[in-house]
């Protein structure tokens, strides 16, 4: 299970008394191993969760931000097909299933956030159903702006830098196609790049 939290405090202030759990650090690009018999909560940074199909294709499952939980619903056989990757440097705190079930605040927090996870999954499924690649890419960028964007000049600035290959994998196309479409989107004013090469998604697309 991975679910997003709004402000960071939503997911962290409710855990007073559990913040003595040690933090684990992973660098940007690292693959994070699933937490055995439990889950990770993000203290700082952003993770992406994907699943590999039997045919070797990567299916994007969503993103998780500070306060979010990752991995609670990975069954034993699913752990081999799921991949958790750090999109930024991340600090994670691990919780066992026993700790979750025995702490009312922690359990309630996980349950409350589940609806956000469901909405994100539904949005990704809807995007995957678009027939045209440009519509899938535009839909993905809009969702990224909602989930990972920060308001700024010209629109929503993505807080992480995503490669064209990562975007291509997410919508089932090629890197070359994504590069071409992003160029067209820039010409049309739908997206831009800031000084740090972060994508800025124009509002109203």
Swiss-Prot record:
Main location: cytoplasm
Tree of life domain: Bacteria
Localization in the cell: Cytoplasm
Pfam families for this protein: HTH_Crp_2
GO terms for cellular component: cytosol
Coiled-coil segments on the chain, per record: none
Gene3D superfamilies cross-referenced by the UniProt entry: Winged helix-like DNA-binding domain superfamily/Winged helix DNA-binding domain
Record carries keyword DNA-binding: yes
Keyword Protein biosynthesis: no
Protein purpose: Probably regulates the expression of genes from the sulfate permease complex.
UniProt name for this protein: Regulatory protein CysR homolog
Protein's organism: Synechocystis sp. (strain ATCC 27184 / PCC 6803 / Kazusa)
